[in-house]
């Protein structure tokens, strides 16, 4: 059995604008929003209208292509000066997502040797489209590899949203659910709600249900009980940054699940493309963890749920040490062993 699964798309290039699925409105409304400036793109990333490491990179690439169309420059030097300014500006939007900087660096490199403004604009648009197309192919390949870790009927726990709307298509951690459905392999997702912004409750459940994949929602503090009582086969998560030794930054709460997986002796997988790896950093201690606004914790849908003036700690990510990870699933295959050596071999020139 091989069928095509219809999955939602988060980013659409229109030539002179970008259309995004506004993920802050889900699951109540599937609202598509038009972005017409680099400032719009920056704000959409900061406000989590676009989120997920690969999608952030894609949005940034299109944002730079869009900005380049609007520069009033008298020569290529002035053009590149404005372009580099916008690259630096976009880099301030989400400091933990390595795909953002990967895409920015790739767009910079694409026009490094270009000597005319017209060609620079054309190349930037082509490069952004290529980044999006490559990500779809990468997610498909990653999903094929991930599917080999599971069997028909498996119940698999996940956190946050590492799905189609966090990438060009298919997703990373959710890719095996979609590829499995295409092949007639039934996988049942258990989705942690993912406080404080509820990406699991709002986004993962929405997109899986839209695609006809079985999904059960749990609160974050139900994870241990669910693993123990619901025959959970494995845990699979995405990543925002993986460093040279395999330490992984992902949505806060991921480390909790890794510890639980070790206790209950079930596999804990990280699914991420090579663009999410940061081999310049040796361990997770070097990763900068973004801290977000306290109102994400003190309010739900604008309703205050905590005492006014209470101290808040709101890290967006945590670090899972490599020794808790059963396998890192990439488009090139599954790493299971000495992560430092295996990751280094992936990036050997």
From Swiss-Prot:
GO terms for molecular function: S-methyl-5-thioribose-1-phosphate isomerase activity. Its EC number is 5.3.1.23. It comes from the Bacteria. The active site is at residue 240. Substrate binds at residues 51-53, 94, 199, 250-251. Pathway: Amino-acid biosynthesis; L-methionine biosynthesis via salvage pathway; L-methionine from S-methyl-5-thio-alpha-D-ribose 1-phosphate: step 1/6. One of its GO terms (biological process) is L-methionine salvage from methylthioadenosine. Keywords: Amino-acid biosynthesis, Isomerase, Methionine biosynthesis. It catalyses: 5-(methylsulfanyl)-alpha-D-ribose 1-phosphate = 5-(methylsulfanyl)-D-ribulose 1-phosphate. The record marks 160 as: Transition state stabilizer. The keyword Protein biosynthesis does not apply. Pfam families: IF-2B. Belongs to the eIF-2B alpha/beta/delta subunits family. MtnA subfamily. Catalyzes the interconversion of methylthioribose-1-phosphate (MTR-1-P) into methylthioribulose-1-phosphate (MTRu-1-P). Homodimer. This is Methylthioribose-1-phosphate isomerase. The gene is mtnA.
């Amino acid at each position: 059995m091989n069928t095509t699964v219809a999955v939602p798309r988060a980013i659409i290039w229109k030539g002179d604008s970008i259309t995004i699925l506004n993920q802050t409105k889900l699951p109540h409304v599937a609202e598509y929003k038009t972005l017409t400036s680099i400032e719009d793109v920056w704000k959409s990333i900061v406000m989590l209208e676009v989120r997920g490491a690969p999608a952030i990179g894609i949005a940034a690439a299109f944002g730079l292509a869009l900005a380049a169309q609007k520069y009033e420059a008298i020569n290529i030097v002035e053009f590149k000066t404005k372009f580099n300014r916008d690259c630096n500006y976009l880099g301030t939007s989400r400091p933990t997502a390595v795909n953002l900087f990967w895409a920015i660096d790739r767009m910079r490199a694409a026009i490094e040797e270009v000597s005319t403004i017209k060609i620079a604009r054309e190349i930037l648009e082509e490069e952004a489209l290529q980044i999006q197309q490559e990500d779809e192919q990468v997610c498909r390949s990653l999903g094929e590899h991930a599917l080999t870790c599971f069997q028909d009927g498996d119940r698999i726990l996940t956190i946050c949203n590492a799905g189609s709307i966090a990438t060009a298509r298919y997703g990373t951690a959710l890719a095996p659910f979609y590829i499995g459905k295409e092949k007639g392999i039934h996988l049942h997702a258990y989705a942690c709600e993912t406080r404080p912004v509820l990406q699991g409750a709002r986004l993962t459940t929405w997109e899986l249900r839209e695609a006809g994949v079985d999904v059960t929602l749990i609160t974050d503090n139900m994870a241990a009980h669910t693993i123990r009582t619901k025959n959970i086969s494995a845990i699979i998560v995405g990543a925002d940054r993986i460093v040279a030794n395999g330490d992984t930054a992902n949505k806060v709460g991921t480390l909790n699940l890794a510890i639980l997986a070790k206790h209950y002796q079930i596999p804990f997988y990280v699914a991420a493309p090579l663009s999410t790896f940061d081999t310049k950093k040796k361990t997770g201690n070097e990763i900068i963890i973004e801290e977000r606004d306290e109102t994400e914790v003190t309010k739900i849908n604008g309703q205050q749920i905590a005492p006014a003036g209470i101290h808040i700690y709101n890290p967006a990510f945590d670090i899972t040490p490599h020794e808790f990870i059963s396998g890192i699933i990439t488009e090139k295959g599954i790493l299971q062993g000495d992560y430092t050596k295996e990751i280094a071999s992936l990036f050997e020139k």
